[in-house]
């Protein structure tokens, strides 16, 4: 399986490979076009902790995948809650806040694309 050619971002969530055992698999989660660079981050936030991010330059995007817990991303006029095992893509050229309002440590992967 190869990544589809996309002009815009896409949540794909497609099984790309399955091993002989059920636990062995690769899932293609999302795709975004990139002009320059992609960053891969791991994050963890303790219960009640938050991180306020400054707006990135126009054209920057983030792909989030939650490993454990539940991540809330607060934007100026809205919020998005992402459960463990789910992905979310957003333009990061706005101010936003990562929030762990759950009852366990939050762990997630963050890709920054620009």
PLM regions with names:
Residues 42, 89, 103-114:
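A short hydrophobic beta-strand segment most commonly corresponding to one strand
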Residues 1-37:
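A short, N-terminal "cap"/entry segment at the start of jelly-roll beta-barrel domains
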Residues 76-93:
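Short acidic-glycine-tyrosine-enriched beta hairpin
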Residues 42-45, 56-73:
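Short, conserved beta-strand element in jelly-roll/cupin
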Residues 63, 70-72, 79, 95, ...:
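Structural motif
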Residues 34-38, 49-62:
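A short beta-loop-beta micro-motif enriched in histidine and acidic residues
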Residues 98-101:
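Asparagine-centered strand-capping/turn motif at beta-strand->loop junctions
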